A protein has these predicted regions:
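C-terminal structured subdomain/cap of oxidoreductase catalytic cores
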Residues: 21-90, 94-95, 206-262, 286-377
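Short, glycine/acidic-rich hinge or "gate" loops at secondary-structure transitions
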Residues: 264-276, 362-367
């Protein structure tokens, strides 16, 4: 295993002896022999690329660029998902602490002294670990939209969402997407999942909304047999209208939040997009202009039945290939209504048990309660 090295994976080579070779480059072409298994953990953007270069991919894609088909697996590189965000910016009264204050060395040193000595100051309790937000929440659809609008949004999920997929998509991937949308609609109807994450940033100067369960689906595809060429990444953001509609309603919710008495007491005045931006079309246009990736890419080597566009089975094994597993965010068939980092940790933990043949039943875990720590030690 080579970690954090400047190595570019080229392809997996398959021999009749069933040994598998992992070719890499680090200035020169090198070959590593795997006597048991290969564990592919290149992430949701590069795991599908390596599989495609190895001939494990939708056959039409490989044929078009002259790569021999090892396994026709339509789901490789499909089902790309990402968390998108919109935001509202506001100005506050002078003197209210801002994140930029922590860049001031004198201020920062004084606040650190207060934090360590008295557990007081701007670093306590939340700003000590503040990198993005002072507070966040995960909000179900019915909690930030009116009931009739939420019902309409859920109906739009259930009403032929497949029309918004790209034209050349395989029928197996379409079938898997239909299962996904049915599950998303059910979770929203029950209120058992969040539709939006809200981040309260910089004392309220920025309120950020992140779409938890987008319906748009993108692709990752190699464009040639050149292993050093980057893959073509098409996230197809906003290709399903539901995604934009939820973010529009999220921004309207921000305005309600900024209008509450506690935040108005801070002198909050919306500055972006500005109160003149009122229609759904104008708000959506603004959101499309500011949105960007959250780098929460998942789904391109999904753990699903092969008939539903799956790439790996429940034991992380790639369909149709001996001794090859994928262990990274690409196996998630759906984005969680949360950040993906902890889920990736869980995937790795579970993968270790699967590969070693361990059962998680009866295992004992060390539970640490941070409240019991001696912070003065």
């Amino acid at each position: 295993m080579v970690c954090c090295a400047a190595i570019n994976a080229v392809r997996l080579l398959f021999k009749t002896s069933r040994k598998q070779f992992f070719s890499t480059t680090a200035g020169s072409l090198q070959t590593a022999v795997a006597t048991q298994e290969i564990i592919l953990s290149a992430g949701a953007l590069h795991s599908p690329k390596i599989l495609q270069l190895s001939g494990i991919a939708p056959a039409p894609l490989l044929t078009n660029i002259g790569i021999n088909v090892t396994v026709n697996l339509p789901g490789v590189g499909e089902n790309l998902q990402d968390h998108l965000f919109g935001l509202t910016l506001a100005s506050l009264n002078p003197g209210i602490p801002a994140n930029s204050d922590l860049v001031n060395a004198t201020f920062d040193a004084a606040q650190r002294d207060l934090h360590y000595a008295k557990r007081k100051g701007e670093l306590f309790p939340s700003r000590w670990t503040d990198t993005i937000a002072e507070a966040l929440s995960f909000i179900p659809l019915y909690n930030f939209t009116k009931a009739d609008l939420a019902n309409n949004l859920i109906s739009s999920i259930e009403a032929n969402s497949t029309q918004y997929l790209h034209d050349s998509i395989d029928s197996a991937v379409v079938a898997g997407y239909e299962k996904q949308t049915a599950l998303i609609a059910s979770m929203h109807s029950k209120g058992s999942t969040a539709a939006m994450e809200l981040l309260y940033v910089d004392g309220g100067r920025s309120v950020v909304n992140i779409l938890m369960h987008p319906l748009s689906r993108g692709t990752v595809s190699v464009t040639s047999s050149d292993p050093f060429a980057p893959p073509a990444i098409d996230p197809r953001y906003f290709s399903h209208p539901y995604d934009g509609q939820v973010l529009v309603e999220s921004l309207r919710f921000n305005r309600k939040l900024l209008a509450t008495a506690p935040i108005q007491a801070l002198g909050a005045i919306e500055t972006l997009p500005g109160t003149a931006t009122e229609s759904d079309a104008d708000i959506l246009s603004f959101i499309k202009g500011v949105t960007s990736t959250e780098y929460h890419y998942v789904g391109t080597c999904a753990m699903l039945p092969k008939a539903l566009g799956g790439v790996v089975d429940a034991k992380l094994k790639v369909y149709g290939v001996d001794g090859l597993r994928v262990v990274d965010a690409s196996i998630m068939p759906l984005l969680p209504s949360a950040h993906t980092q902890a889920t990736v940790y869980a995937i790795a933990e579970k993968a270790a048990d699967i590969i070693l043949g361990h059962s998680v039943e009866g295992r004992q875990y060390l539970v640490i309660n941070p409240r019991s720590w001696d912070h003065n030690a």
